[in-house]
Structure formats: structure tokens, C-alpha cells
Amino acid sequence: MWVNGAKVSEQPLYNTAKTVGSVFQNPRSQFFNVDTTSEITFGCENLGQPEQSIRERLEKTVRDFRLEKLMGRNIFHLSGGEKQKIACAGVSIMEPDVLVMDEPSSNLDASSILDLRATLAFWKSQGKTVIVSEHRLYYLRGLADRFIYITGGKVEKDYSAAEFESLTEQQRAKLGLRTFILEDLLPPKALPQAGQQMELRNFCFAYKNEPETLHIRESKIPANRIVGIIGNNGAGKSTFSRCFCGLEKRCGEVIWNGRTYRPKDRLNTCYMVMQEVNHQLFTETVLDEVLISMEEENQEWAEEILAELDLIGFKDRHPMSLSGGQKQRVAIASAIASKRSILFFDEPTSGLDYKHMKEVANVLKQVRDAGITLYVITHDLELLLDCCTDIVHFEDGSIIDKFQMDEAGLEKIRNYFIKGVPTK
């Protein structure tokens, strides 16, 4: 491989780093610092740039990425999307000629995706080469000049922007690709009858020495359904899920079916698939990962779950050797095997192509039909429309709206996701 006339394999890494910047699919795997400001400037410091130059670049990068509220923060207290922003800023500050991005939008909210699009457009206007490996395609419409389709490690097709846009949604789906035009994803659909509700009381939480990030004094949310939880990065969605599942002690009560569930009780009732699934993969094989979640091991059922999620061929592989999307599906399989009555999924389709997103959606619907309550934190409009019956909208640590996915709900979703996105 050659970059700017130089063979990459023959160049020392520090030389390549001056020319090529990269953002990993899991941003945490490229962090070297605990606080956000130090992380952004780390690359420039590593390249030995003058202190004043680094300060000036930092100020510009913070403005370009609108990161004022994230400066000086503990990286481990950020949401997945906020970590992604810090990773992008840490690469941009070094001003490379070539930027390689692996699923940069996978954990970003609708507003942040528009910010990402603006950043890509800015880099493009500067004459930089930007290579984006993506499953989520709609935000690249009108921006990307070429679309290269890779399968089995080989380039199968090379489309111009016009050629790719001329494909029908059916043709793209056949290739396993996500939608390119969001408006095409908004058909009306039949909804199951509204079911029970859970009552929340005193769901308030703050990290040590930081402002309160969750403040729900009293509210009700649907039960026995697939509930999509939406909101911008940092709105409190992941914190809410941790508190609900009992992972944060002393946080709130849930009243359901006439019983009050305190945090300790909820540990045995809920199961959470985390946004960063590496935190909950423990065993030597994929099959063992599913079996360990069962009260009584049932290999036949475990293999059925893996087959439903297109993982049976990986049952003897080490979970950490899989791709990000495959790890995500392994964690989902473990959640299903646990037979808990309430399941939380934090971005379950990040990094998944169309085929595997549909498989996850179908499995979630099957689990719901078995009487399980599912809460799905997601920025994935395709997943919401495929399987969610209700939406809970978070903002600034509070629930600001709740609605069914009926015609009125679809209009709200349109306003949330499609505003600012190129349309037909």
C-alpha cells in the first residue's frame, strides 16, 4: 500500500502518523489519557510540536467540534458518542492529509451525526482524503464521491456517487447495505395493544464531585413491549439503564405488578447489554459465553440462539477475536439466554450491517412475544422502525416525551432524526 508516493510498510510509524490519522470503531481502544483535554492534545505532543502551536490547535479543534462542555472531563464518565467525538478531535488536531475512519457514526446521536457530516465536508473542502468504513450510509449522501463495496476481503464493486444513488433500496438491501434515504423508512405499521406500565420513583444520580446527570422524580414507562430510548449523547440514557438494572446502588425504586423493586432486587430481574461489550465477555469460547448466562446449561438451546444471530459458525472462537458487531451479537445472545424478565440493550446494532441488524430486530421481537420487556437505547432509526412499539425520549437527564410508534409518533421520529439530513 502506498500513501502520497511512500510505501507504508517501509515507513517508520511516526512518519505515517504525520500523514494518516485514524479513528477506531471502539474509541476507547485508542485512548491514552484519563481526561479529555489531554487526550485531544496527546498526538501533537507525541509528534513534538511546540506548546503554543498545540494550544492554538486545541482552541480551533474545540470550536470545530463544539466540545466546550466536554473539556477537562473524565473520559470514563463520557457516553460512547462523546468518546467518539473526543477520538475524532484527537485525530483532527494533528491535521493529517489522509483520515481513515472506522464506523465513526456508530455511537453518535442524530445531531452529532450532522456535526460529523459537517466535519467531513470541512476536511473535504481542505483537499484532504477521507476514507470512511461505514454501515450507516444516509449521512454520506451528497458528500461521498465514491462508494467501494467490499465483501470477503475483496473489492466487489466501485460506484460513483451517482451510480450508488441510482440503486433501489431493494438492490442495496440485497447487498446487505443500510438505507441511503431516510424518508423511505417511515411506513405506518400495526402496533400491539398497549400493555402494563412500570412506575419509576426517585431515579436521581450523580458521579462523585460532578453535577447530577439523572433526575427523574416520578414517571411511568411501558412494560411488556420493545421500548426505544432516544436522546442526544450525554442525555442520561446509559446512566438510566445502569440505575434501572441496579448497577448503581441507592438509585430509585421501580413499582411493577404491585411490587416494589429496589436496586438489589433489580440485579436479579434485569440484564443489560452494555455499549462497550468488551466489559462483559469473560469466557474462552462464544458458546461458553452463552452457557454462562443460563441458570442450567442447555447447549442445544444455546446453539439455537447463536444460529438465530448468525453466530453458530463462531461458537468455538474466542469472543475477543471477533469483530465489534459480532461481539455485540454474542452479548445479545447471552442476554436472551439469561431468561431475565427485563432486558436493556445499549446500542445493540452499532457496527452492524443491514442483514445482521434485521436478525437482531427479529430476535428482539421473538423475545418480546415470550413476555419479556425490552428497553433499547439506540440512535438507529432502522432498528426503531423495525421492532420498537414505544419511544421514551431523554434530554438533560429527564424524560421529556413518551409516545407510541403510531402516525403521530412517526412524525416525531421524523423531526428528531431527519431534520438537517439531505432529502430527495
Language-model region placement:
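Conserved beta-strand-loop-alpha-helix hinge in the C-terminal portion
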Residues: 154-177, 398-421
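Hydrophobic anchor residue at the start of the ABC signature
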Residues: 88-89, 332
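Catalytic Walker B motif of ABC-type/P-loop ATPase nucleotide-binding domains
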Residues: 99-102, 343-346
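Conserved ABC ATPase signature
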Residues: 74-78, 82, 318-322, 326
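ABC-family nucleotide-binding domains
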Residues: 109, 353
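Conserved ABC ATPase "signature" region
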Residues: 53-70, 299-314
